[in-house]
Amino acid sequence: MQPQIRNMNLLKLRLSMVGTLATIIGLSTLVFAIIMSLVGVFDILSLGVVVVVFNLIQWLISPYLIGAIYRVRELSENENPHLHRMIGNLSKKSKISKPKLMLAQISIPNAFAYGSPLTGSHVAVTKGLLDTLNEDEVKAVVGHELGHLKHRDVQIMMVVSFLPALFYYIGFSLMLSNMYRGRRDDNGGSALIGIGFMVFSWILNMFILYLSRLREYYADRHAVSVLNNGAQKLSTSLAKIVKTTRRINETGKSKQQKPNLSAYKALFISDPDRANEDSVELAIMENKSNQNLVRELTSKKLTFADKLLEAFSTHPNIVKRLRALQELS
């Protein structure tokens, strides 16, 4: 269940959010590790405590950060009773409590699920999503996001994302210890060990990216399970999201939003900055119906570059994702 590729970026899953927040955690932990090393109070246990604490704090306050960055506000039932009923019905089918419905004032069509014990669960839709998709397509996107909440993907990815950060900063701090505390009697042994830890953290992170992509497929399956003809609806919604994002980028309508979108674009269903690059073929297929567009994309042969880009992505390749949805139809 996951994705970024040369043709188009996919349903943004809650998991990409966690990946973005992990970057913030990592940078903060790095600063603390440097300080602790330089002042002479560094040890493995203290660094581990710092990493754990920062992960927990980041997770707890992340809804507030997301709300500020994306101008998210709660959408009252009076403003959009139909959307509230839709999410309520899908939540019942998903056998979860209805999350808070949020609206992000962004013209690019997208949606995301997030939350913490302090705020509860949220599903946010952008203004652009409501303006672009029809009712069935919005249902498919929301069903995908509810799948992330049902499967507790936020919590799972938060826990596993902590591990590579821990090993990386242990390795980095070992290198700092060798450089700044005069430990040269080991002939650079601690520095080599530190490099080994950093390489291991990178390898571990590749497995975590793979896990994230699997959970994207899992969320897609959930959307299909709670909707009639869900596979087709989710497929067409993805095609329309990419087409519209590309058009908005080309006309420059989202320029004022781009700095924020670029900073935390991993939170989204699809990468708004990659829409032009990821949809070269879409320019040729622009006038085709959404169903024809889906068929064109699923027939595309994946290149080595496509597969390589997917390996470093939190989401699956769009072609593979659409093919998986076809198998569920």
Predicted features along the sequence, with ranges:
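Active-site recognition of the HExxH zinc-binding catalytic motif
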Residues: 63, 87, 125, 140-148, ...
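Active-site scaffold of zinc-dependent metalloenzymes
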Residues: 111-135, 152
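Active-site-flanking alpha-helical
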Residues: 70, 134, 138, 147-152, ...
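C-terminal capping/extension segments of zinc metalloprotease domains
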Residues: 225-240, 248-329
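Cytosolic juxtamembrane N-terminal segments of multi-pass membrane proteins
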Residues: 1-11, 123, 142-149
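Short pre-active-site segment immediately N-terminal to the catalytic Zn-binding motif
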Residues: 75, 127-140, 207
